[in-house]
């Protein structure tokens, strides 16, 4: 995959070249999307909109730390949707990991989560965030136990993941209604990189065959159900709903 690669560390140790070969990235000087290695982290920038800033994965500080400490925990909609109750903490495959936010919330309340991400740039960002998270004194221990990354396409990986999870979680990209600043800067940068999930409808059936209990699909409230398969079961929040489908028991 072609992207502009920029090293701002000043270290001159070739770390960016190692990273590029690991994730199959090729430097393209004219690409509007840039993957930048800074002294702190790896980040994604949209070069024609510098005001948007860089996007990076941070499980240790910022909004994720706040959500972990002061968020709803088990009361969060995603936790309710996957079926967390009492001692039941399902094993989850997050088949559309993105920046790992929902996966992190589930891991922080005790679920084991395997994240699937097919885009190599997003996978590199996730891997960088995980490495910093794993090394953190406060969260590193449980994060290593509960949150892992698999760089693979969900369309193929969903058929051969073992052991089977109890829950498969899907949050495919859906075109935004607004073109304004209401669309978070992050989503704008993200959609420039990966585009809409045109094959997302193809994920529902393999997800239902893989999950032993349920499949949870996060949708904007205005979006039709995935693959146009309606379900009466959903956890509804302001702006989103989590559609719940039966899996395939062992």
Swiss-Prot record:
Protein residues bound to S-adenosyl-L-methionine: 101-102, 117-118, 153-154, 171
Gene Ontology cellular component annotations, sorted alphabetically: cytoplasm
Cell compartment(s), UniProt: Cytoplasm
Cytoplasm as UniProt keyword: yes
Major enzyme class: transferase
Catalytic activity of the protein: guanosine(1516) in 16S rRNA + S-adenosyl-L-methionine = N(2)-methylguanosine(1516) in 16S rRNA + S-adenosyl-L-homocysteine + H(+)
CDD domains the UniProt entry points to: AdoMet_MTases
One term of GO molecular function: rRNA (guanine-N2-)-methyltransferase activity
Keywords associated with the record: Cytoplasm, Methyltransferase, rRNA processing, S-adenosyl-L-methionine, Transferase
Pfam families reported in the protein's UniProt record: SAM_MT
Classification via SUPFAM superfamilies: S-adenosyl-L-methionine-dependent methyltransferases
EC number: 2.1.1.242
Superkingdom to which the source organism belongs: Bacteria
Chief location bin: cytoplasm
UniProt family annotation: Belongs to the methyltransferase superfamily. RsmJ family.
HAMAP family in UniProt: 16SrRNA_methyltr_J (MF_01523)
Function description: Specifically methylates the guanosine in position 1516 of 16S rRNA.
Full protein name: Ribosomal RNA small subunit methyltransferase J
């Amino acid at each position: 995959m072609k992207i502009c690669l920029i090293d701002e560390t000043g270290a001159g140790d070739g770390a960016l070249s190692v990273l590029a070969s690991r994730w199959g990235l090729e430097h393209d000087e004219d690409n509007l999307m840039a993957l930048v290695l800074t002294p702190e982290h790896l980040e994604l920038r949209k070069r024609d909109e510098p005001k948007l800033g860089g996007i990076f994965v941070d499980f240790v500080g910022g909004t994720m730390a706040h959500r972990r400490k002061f968020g709803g925990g088990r009361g969060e909609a995603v936790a309710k949707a996957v079926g967390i109750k009492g001692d039941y903490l399902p094993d989850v495959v997050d088949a559309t990991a993105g920046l790992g936010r929902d996966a992190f919330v589930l891991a922080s309340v005790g679920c084991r989560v395997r994240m699937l991400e097919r885009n190599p740039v997003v996978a590199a960002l996730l891997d960088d965030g995980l490495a910093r998270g794993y090394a953190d004194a406060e969260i590193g221990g449980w994060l290593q136990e509960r949150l892992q990354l698999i760089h693979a396409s969900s369309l193929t990986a969903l058929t051969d993941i073992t052991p089977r999870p109890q829950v498969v979680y899907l949050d495919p990209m859906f075109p935004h209604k607004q073109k304004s600043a209401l669309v978070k800067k992050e989503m704008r940068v993200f959609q420039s990189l990966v585009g809409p999930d045109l094959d997302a409808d193809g994920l529902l059936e393999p997800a239902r065959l893989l999950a032993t209990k349920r499949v949870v699909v996060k949708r904007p409230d205005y979006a039709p159900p995935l693959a146009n398969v309606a379900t009466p079961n959903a956890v509804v929040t302001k702006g989103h709903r989590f559609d719940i489908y039966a899996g395939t028991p062992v």
